[in-house]
């Protein structure tokens, strides 16, 4: 390795945008790409035409984008208040920071809290992998606890013990997803009670990437909890994964710090415009959610009929599928075989932590997925 590179980076591997791919090449479009929790619906043609017109007539390619994001922040604040039914003490632009995807915001939060041996982070696996990955790339220790295998609730006893015993550096940030990825379960009453009990010295990051599908939010907690941050994204329900726009909602003092550490001009003009157009037309874009939820219910019902499979309830736009005990193969081997057979059949899903995470696709994609799973189980 080059002598000027940090030695701990030698153990890392580059993140594959599509983990189901054997190479770094882009996944062919003819495959059913159900491995990254994207929306199955592209933007409507009329919105694409509006964006094309904006690019041609309004955006000046030779000029830097709006680095303050004020118009976008105002629009986001309005949507947050509307979606959380907040009338008193409403969210304002001062409560919003915008990032190049939620990943940038996660990285900024880590820089603001833990960099320079100031803190560690706590995550409960399985969960969104980027919390740990981004922390490790910054040299920040990652403390992990497990989850209850039955309902995927965080092992709260282990989590509390980790917070009490971890020193030099202490745990400064706890990351949770609501609902969790890959297991699709929302935070439980016990988990919420524990999060609320944590010291204000600890930052609690609640990732609501799938809020539009769960319709369960903790935005109202921010008024009385200045140590809480809520993350959201335009990549899922708003169909803008290609534009990389995420945002967080937090106390104005926390937002002021994030604005200090984020990169200048971090969002391209086209991404800013796309997010604004999406918010202005949110009623149209969010019309796809009932169909996705209906398809999710149909997929869970169909898969639950197979005695070999355990299918968890879902509050997101994906399901978590596990294999029951197989006398022929170890659970890991059986899961690997199923994953590979699905891929060979043209269905990409995510293999992770003892199960398969399957994004809800179009009705046609879901039918093919069911057929491919059925065929794979017959061959097993």
Curated annotation (Swiss-Prot):
It comes from the Bacteria. Signal peptide: none annotated. Pathway: Amino-acid biosynthesis; L-histidine biosynthesis; L-histidine from 5-phospho-alpha-D-ribose 1-diphosphate: step 7/9. It catalyses: L-histidinol phosphate + 2-oxoglutarate = 3-(imidazol-4-yl)-2-oxopropyl phosphate + L-glutamate. Keywords: Amino-acid biosynthesis, Aminotransferase, Histidine biosynthesis, Pyridoxal phosphate, Transferase. Its cofactor is pyridoxal 5'-phosphate. The modification N6-(pyridoxal phosphate)lysine is found at residue 236. GO terms for molecular function: histidinol-phosphate transaminase activity; pyridoxal phosphate binding. It is an enzyme of class 2 (transferase). Its EC number is 2.6.1.9. GO terms for biological process: L-histidine biosynthetic process. Homodimer. PANTHER family: HISTIDINOL-PHOSPHATE AMINOTRANSFERASE (PTHR42885:SF2), HISTIDINOL-PHOSPHATE AMINOTRANSFERASE-RELATED (PTHR42885). Belongs to the class-II pyridoxal-phosphate-dependent aminotransferase family. Histidinol-phosphate aminotransferase subfamily. HAMAP family: HisC_aminotrans_2. This is Histidinol-phosphate aminotransferase 2. It comes from Trichormus variabilis (strain ATCC 29413 / PCC 7937) (Anabaena variabilis).
């Amino acid at each position: 390795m080059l002598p000027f590179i940090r030695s701990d980076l030698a153990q890392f591997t580059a993140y594959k945008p599509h983990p189901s791919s054997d190479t770094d090449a882009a996944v062919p479009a003819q495959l059913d790409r159900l491995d990254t929790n994207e929306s199955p619906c592209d933007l409507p043609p009329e919105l694409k035409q509006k964006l094309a017109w904006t690019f041609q007539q309004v955006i000046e390619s030779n000029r830097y984008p709006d680095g303050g994001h004020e118009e976008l922040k105002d629009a986001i604040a309005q949507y947050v208040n509307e979606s959380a039914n907040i009338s008193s003490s409403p969210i304002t632009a001062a409560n919003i920071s915008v990032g190049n995807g939620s990943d940038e915001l996660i990285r900024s939060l880590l820089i603001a809290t833990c960099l320079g041996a100031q803190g560690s982070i706590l995550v409960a696996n399985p969960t969104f992998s980027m919390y740990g990955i981004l922390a490790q790339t910054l040299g920040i220790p990652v403390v992990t606890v497990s989850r209850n295998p039955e309902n995927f609730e965080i092992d709260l006893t282990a989590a509390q013990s980790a917070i009490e015993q971890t020193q030099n550096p202490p745990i400064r940030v706890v990351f949770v997803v609501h609902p969790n990825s890959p297991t699709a379960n929302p935070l439980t009453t016990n988990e919420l009670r524990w999060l609320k009990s944590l010291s204000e010295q600890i930052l609690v990051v609640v990732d609501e990437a799938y809020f539009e599908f769960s319709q369960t939010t903790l935005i109202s907690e921010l008024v009385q909890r200045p140590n809480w941050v809520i993350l959201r994204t335009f990549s899922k329900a708003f169909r803008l994964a290609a534009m990389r726009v995420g945002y967080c909602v937090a106390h104005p003092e926390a937002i002021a710090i994030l604005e200090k550490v984020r990169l200048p001009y971090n969002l391209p003009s086209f991404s800013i415009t796309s997010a604004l157009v999406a918010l202005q037309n949110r009623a149209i874009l969010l019309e796809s959610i009932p169909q996705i939820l209906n398809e999710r219910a149909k997929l869970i019902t169909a898969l639950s009929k197979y005695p070999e499979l355990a299918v968890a309830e879902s509050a997101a736009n994906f399901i978590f599928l596990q294999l029951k005990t197989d006398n022929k193969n170890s659970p890991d081997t059986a899961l690997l075989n199923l994953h590979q057979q699905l891929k060979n059949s043209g269905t990409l899903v995510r293999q992770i932590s003892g199960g398969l995470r399957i994004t809800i696709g179009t009705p046609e994609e879901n039918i093919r997925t069911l057929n491919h799973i059925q065929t794979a189980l017959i061959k097993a």
